[in-house]
């Protein structure tokens, strides 16, 4: 065994466990963990901007199902040859455990669901988009760990020290099952861990968003535009390293082309959006007004309890009380 082999990154022996007849999929657990972290972080960021943190959970309730549906639709459209061929079963297109989700479909349909909810509640969307952006990219980073468990979305074979070992996995009947099976211990390839490259890139963009938002007090949707630009820039070069089957457009993998187009649009939007950040009262006017009214009521109640007459304190009258 050489040094390169010793330094290689091992894949997990399996990505699916069973609790009786119920499959526990590591990929799904990673996605759920990412969603929980994103909600937690967004609540803190949205409240700091002046918004109602309870709105974040409401938005997640509509965004997550829509995002899953949108992600699946995008995946099926861009990889339609896997589901609509002579030997394919079109029903497999409905099975999200077969092939996974596409991030752009999740962002688009999930974003539309949140937009509709905020429009219904008459709450400005831009401050929320800026609050949620770091949480989204962090959730994507966590979700990429699911690809590690599934032994998928990797690049060409390599002998670099950080190469990923791909194991031969089999099901209970001994048949080859790279995603749902259990490792035999046999290494069948060492490859570029492109999922890891994207995870690290996403963490880098997460740090950039947090820093830029604090340093420049970004608002009006600019944090979200920066997230889109940063993510697509990384996806553009990482996508070209992948070797899994993909739909080709103009000689490029379709996600490479989509990333290039979306990156350009995101940069244009970022440059055209207004500078500065919304005042807390602009983030959610109704919530801010309700908070101000509640504070006034509590102040009046405190004055009544202490016997202080509002507007008639020593500080306001300039007289000492004896």
UniProtKB/Swiss-Prot annotation:
Metabolic or biological pathway: Protein modification; lipoprotein biosynthesis (diacylglyceryl transfer)
Record region (Disordered): 283-322
Signal peptide: none
GO cellular component: plasma membrane
Membrane topology: Multi-pass membrane protein
Chief place of localization: membrane
Pfam families linked: LGT
Record's keyword terms, sorted: Cell membrane, Membrane, Transferase, Transmembrane, Transmembrane helix
Residues at which a 1,2-diacyl-sn-glycero-3-phospho-(1'-sn-glycerol) binds: 144
Enzyme's top EC category: transferase
Domain of life of the organism encoding this protein: Bacteria
One of the protein's GO biological processes: lipoprotein biosynthetic process
Catalytic activity, EC: 2.5.1.145
Cell compartments where the protein resides: Cell membrane
MF term (GO), any: phosphatidylglycerol-prolipoprotein diacylglyceryl transferase activity
Membrane spanning stretches: 21-41, 50-70, 98-118, 123-143, 191-211, 254-274
Family: Belongs to the Lgt family.
PANTHER family in UniProt: PHOSPHATIDYLGLYCEROL--PROLIPOPROTEIN DIACYLGLYCERYL TRANSFERASE, PROLIPOPROTEIN DIACYLGLYCERYL TRANSFERASE
Primary role: Catalyzes the transfer of the diacylglyceryl group from phosphatidylglycerol to the sulfhydryl group of the N-terminal cysteine of a prolipoprotein, the first step in the formation of mature lipoproteins.
HAMAP family found in the cross-reference section: Lgt (MF_01147)
Protein's name according to its UniProt entry: Phosphatidylglycerol--prolipoprotein diacylglyceryl transferase
Underlying gene: lgt
């Amino acid at each position: 065994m050489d040094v390169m082999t010793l330094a290689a990154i091992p894949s997990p022996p399996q990505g699916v466990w069973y609790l009786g007849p119920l499959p526990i999929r590591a990929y799904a657990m990673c996605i759920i963990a990412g969603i929980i972290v994103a909600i937690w972080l967004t609540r803190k960021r949205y409240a700091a901007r002046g918004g109602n943190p309870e709105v974040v959970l409401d938005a997640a309730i509509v965004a997550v199902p829509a995002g899953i549906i949108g992600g699946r639709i995008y995946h099926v459209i861009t990889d339609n040859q896997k589901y609509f061929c002579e030997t394919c079963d079109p029903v497999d297109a409905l099975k999200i455990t077969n092939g996974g989700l596409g991030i752009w479909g999740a962002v688009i349909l999930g974003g539309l669901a949140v937009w509709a909810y905020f429009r219904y509640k008459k709450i400005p969307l831009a401050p929320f988009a800026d609050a949620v952006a770091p949480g989204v990219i962090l959730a994507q980073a966590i979700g990429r760990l699911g690809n590690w468990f599934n032994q998928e979305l990797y690049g060409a074979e390599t002998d670099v020290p950080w190469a990923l070992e791909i194991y031969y996995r089999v099901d209970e009947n001994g048949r080859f099952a790279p995603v749902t099976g259990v490792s035999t211990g046999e290494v069948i390839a060492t490859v570029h861990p492109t999922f890891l490259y994207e995870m690290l890139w996403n963490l880098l963009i997460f740090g950039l968003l947090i820093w830029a938002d604090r340093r420049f007090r970004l608002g009006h949707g600019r944090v979200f535009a920066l997230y889109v630009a940063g993510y697509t820039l990384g996806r553009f070069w990482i996508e070209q390293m992948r070797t899994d089957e993909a739909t080709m457009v103009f000689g490029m993998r379709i996600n490479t082309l989509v990333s290039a187009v979306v990156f350009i649009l995101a940069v244009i939007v970022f440059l055209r959006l207004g500078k500065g950040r919304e005042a807390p009262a602009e983030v959610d006017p109704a919530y801010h007004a309700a908070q101000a009214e509640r504070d006034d009521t509590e102040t009046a109640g405190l004055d009544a309890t202490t016997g202080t007459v509002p507007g008639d304190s020593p500080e306001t009258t300039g007289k000492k009380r004896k």
